[in-house]
Amino acid sequence: MRTACGYSVVELMSVVSIAGILMTVGVPSFRYVTNSNRVTAEVNSLYFDLELARSTAVAMGLPVTVCPSTDGQTCVPSAEIWQSGWIIFSDSNGNGVVDSGDEVLMVRAAFTSSTDTFLSSQGVSAVTFNREGFAINLPSSSTGFTTITLHTQPQSPAWTRCIQVSTIGMLTTEHAQQGSCT
């Protein structure tokens, strides 16, 4: 008598059906996790660079600015281009522009995802910290802070994150509940 080797068609179809059911349940939640982690990493990148600029300003005793940049050398005067990368530079006169004598301290490359955008609530195109660590040159607002929001396309409250910069230099991050931060 011969012993059977291999799988029957019924066994094979059972395994394929179970794998299909698991994929149907698992893939959407995996997509959520990967998008959420990507957005969190992008927000953390800007958050920690703002913290670095603040601590560098205090350590160096002179203003340090973070601004969007596409070439790694100059600031782009647009509040809607942060996703293209940014630079941190010593800003001796605190005007938010790279002048002669200012030193670029760090360059951050553009996001890997072309669908994510950082937008500022008050059109902030640069954040400057003075030697005391206070944020200067921010537009005045009734709340006392400026919000920079990361949106994905299509916009989803689940993947929207915000960084709030107060005039005293305090930074906080927030997960948007209804698509925008408070």
What residues fall within each predicted segment?
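N-terminal leader/signal peptides at the extreme start of proteins
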Residues: M1-V9, T172
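Short, contiguous hydrophobic alpha-helices characteristic of membrane insertion segments
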Residues: G6-V27
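N-terminal helix-rich module
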Residues: M13, V25-S55, A59, P63-T182
